[in-house]
């Protein structure tokens, strides 16, 4: 699994475009999607120790992506 900074950099390179595109589709704003993508990878990095491998890594990352985007959309509602 992810055991070093190099491994995490590889993970980011592998998923950054897919995560950004998913965030952009959900948020509809380029700058918001870029900010969300950074936030998502910070959360992924912090939560990797909790990843149990019960789901595919990509599914886990996309779930974090959806949760971050939903949270951002809710915070913008009046």
Residue ranges of each PLM-predicted region?
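Residue-level detection of beta-strand scaffold positions
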Residues: 8-9, 26-27, 65
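Short alpha-helical functional segments enriched in proximate histidine and acidic residues
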Residues: 22, 26, 47, 68, ...
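Generic leucine side-chain signal with a strong bias for well-ordered alpha-helical environments
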Residues: 11, 27, 42, 48, ...
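A short, charge-rich alpha-helical start-of-domain segment used by transcription regulators
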Residues: 2-21, 34-37, 45
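Structural recognition of an alpha-helix C-terminal capping motif at a helix-to-coil junction
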Residues: 21, 35-42, 55-67
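Arg/Lys-rich amphipathic alpha helix in sigma70-family domain 2
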Residues: 50-52, 66-78
């Amino acid at each position: 699994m992810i055991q070093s900074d190099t491994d995490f950099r590889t993970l980011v390179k592998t998923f950054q475009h897919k995560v950004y595109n998913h965030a952009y589709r959900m948020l509809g704003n380029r700058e918001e999607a870029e900010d969300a993508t950074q936030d998502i990878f910070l959360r992924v990095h912090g939560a990797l120790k909790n990843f149990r491998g019960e789901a595919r890594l990509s599914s886990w990352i996309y779930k974090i992506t959806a949760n971050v985007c939903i949270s951002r959309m809710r915070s913008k509602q009046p």
